[in-house]
Amino acid sequence: MSSQETYEFQAEITQLMSLIINTVYSNKEIFLRELISNASDALDKIRYQSLSDPKVLESDPELFIRLTPKPEEKVLEIRDSGIGMTKAELINNLGTIAKSGTKAFMEALSAGADVSMIGQFGVGFYSLFLVADRVQVISKHNDDEQYIWESNAGGSFTVTLDEVNERIGRGTILRLFLKEDQLEYLEEKRIKEVVKRHSEFVAYPIQLLVTKEVEKEVPVEEEEKKEETEDDKKPKLEEVDEEEEDKEKSKTKKVKENVKELEELNKTKPLWTRNPSEVTQEEYNAFYKSISNDWEDPLAVKHFSVEGQLEFRAILFIPKRAPFDLFESKKKKNNIKLYVRRVFITDEAEELIPEWLSFVKGVVDSEDLPLNLSREMLQQNKIMKVIKKNIVKKLIEAFNEIAEDSEQFEKFYSAFAKNIKLGIHEDSQNRASLAKLLRYNSTKSVDEQTSLADYVTRMPEHQKNVYFITGESIKAVEKSPFLDALKAKNFEVLFLVDPIDEYAFQQLKEFEGKQLVDITKDFELEESEEEKKQREEEIKEFEPLTAALKEVLGDQVEKVVVSYKLIDAPAAIRTGQFGWSANMERIMKAQALRDSTMSSYMASKKIFEISPKSAIIKELKKRVEDNGAQDRTVKDLTSLLYETALLTSGFTLEEPASFATRINRLISLGLNIDEEESTETAAETATEAPVEEVAPETAMEEVD
């Protein structure tokens, strides 16, 4: 025998196998689903290769998956005539290179997740250790010799040139040496049960080697022949053809014997070719699990066909939960399997479905696409674009159907709200349809989310726009000073607290003819003639104060204005219409690779709004009139007011230390502590404050 080569498992794989082999998980049958799924993938690869090079199938023209139980050896064999693995692939794929999902699956498992999720993480092969404590993988690739990969789930595995087993032409045999308490998986009945439950809709024949009792005609025994000879000596009646026939028959007899033969377990025709009215929900659920590696039933299914100039059939499934790597950009999405006239082509047709719908799983079978589709043809093919357009349309229909059941829609929205918002941002054609699916908490719906359509029905007659506020969380926005004036007018405000919300609304711009207005930016609020008149008077009255505040704050603000949109709060900071909001500025600052030039360009000039109704503002106005803008107390109070407004308006402070110094001075004042008693450090920090030079007297001594 050829010399063995021993390799160490990658550390994460060793941990994974240890977790699996020692699990107390009861539903261990899923190992067969995972291994059949891997076999099906290997067959997909060789069939796809054969479309451009038919010679690759010469090593074994038949495409199949074969299950062979060997009770006497306590071994279950799973064979496929797929693409097979080279020596290097056996080493890398099964042992030394951990897949991205290895660690993620272990973390999920430690957190109490179901072992049956293993396929979603791309490490389904190792599920065999649920039932086996040793495995041999015998594999033959067209470009290499036949090799044996072997492991007992320890820290290492061996690879050997195969000189002992039968030649398999092409493909892979998994030889599982079952644990003593898992021998049920050698029973014909149990195997059939598991295949029917999990793998009935695999596209290739799954054959099971079964033992059947058959009747067979065999020659009669010698004694019987002798008796026959004696009978021949007796006088006979005239023979006829029938008697001759009987005579022939009498020379054989029927006996029962056991024979082994292959039985196909998945004869059901492809589900998508059947009429939707003939397919049961159980069949849809089973089919979904077979193509998705999910252990749960789908939330919804859309089964349809398109006929006319273009023909295709599709079954699309919406899962109950988002996969762990939904927004992992480097991972290839392989959720939609593309067939052409029942022949599998690829599960990497990214052109078939937009990225924002990448959570949808299913099958598309086209009658019109060519069988020899290349990557370039997929990207440029007009038929693909039409199929994609139809798929998106049907899925939006499905989402609206889910929305009719509030409980189901809540599950859907909690899992895939980000996808809907991404769709609004990216898909201009379907933006208006998707907007109907959006749900938000609001000033009138704090505990339950509301739709934009319901918002519009609640709008007072004189309200012209749909108002929203952006922020980090509901708690951060529900006490915002920006809400006061709108609440006073009975105008509802939507709370947008998901970072993607603002991107979506920037593209959406309007809903049912009503403008979407961000109240953290400068905007025109509906007002009566009386309110307009009062505002004009207040602007005139507070003009000296706004000029003084602008003088103190300088370039920190674009302008200081008297606000008619504030009630309780003394001041707030709004941004211009076309720059970033405070929330967007926060999001962009968190981007590690942000463009600093773009940041300085888009960071909008700030508008400092003061409320003429506020007692603080009225007192500050009086101080300015008495002492002028350069008064120490006026300057200090202005800076404190501005920095506080920055915080309540959702901004971050550029110089928190200066702000802290001013607050500490206020605390000292409240506690009747003289400035001389303050620490030297505090005094030094105060000198660094940007708004003034340090005066010899207590900065806030005049404040009551």
Swiss-Prot record:
One of its GO terms (biological process) is cellular response to heat. GO terms for molecular function: ATP binding; ATP hydrolysis activity; ATP-dependent protein folding chaperone; unfolded protein binding. It is found in: Cytoplasm. InterPro entries: HATPase_C_sf (IPR036890), Heat_shock_protein_90_CS (IPR019805), HSP90_C (IPR037196), Hsp90_fam (IPR001404), Hsp90_N (IPR020575), Ribosomal_Su5_D2-typ_SF (IPR020568). Residues 680-689 have a biased composition (Low complexity). Gene3D superfamilies: 3.30.230.80, 3.40.50.11260, Heat shock protein 90, C-terminal domain (1.20.120.790), Histidine kinase-like ATPase, C-terminal domain (3.30.565.10). Residues 219-255, 675-704 are annotated as: Disordered. Keywords: ATP-binding, Chaperone, Cytoplasm, Nucleotide-binding, Stress response. Pfam families: HATPase_c_3, HSP90. A motif (TPR repeat-binding) lies at residues 700-704. It comes from the Eukaryota. Residues 226-238 have a biased composition (Basic and acidic residues). Homodimer. HAMAP family: HSP90 (MF_00505). Belongs to the heat shock protein 90 family. NCBIfam families: PRK05218.1 (NF003555). This is Heat shock protein HSP82. It comes from Eremothecium gossypii (strain ATCC 10895 / CBS 109.51 / FGSC 9923 / NRRL Y-1056) (Yeast).
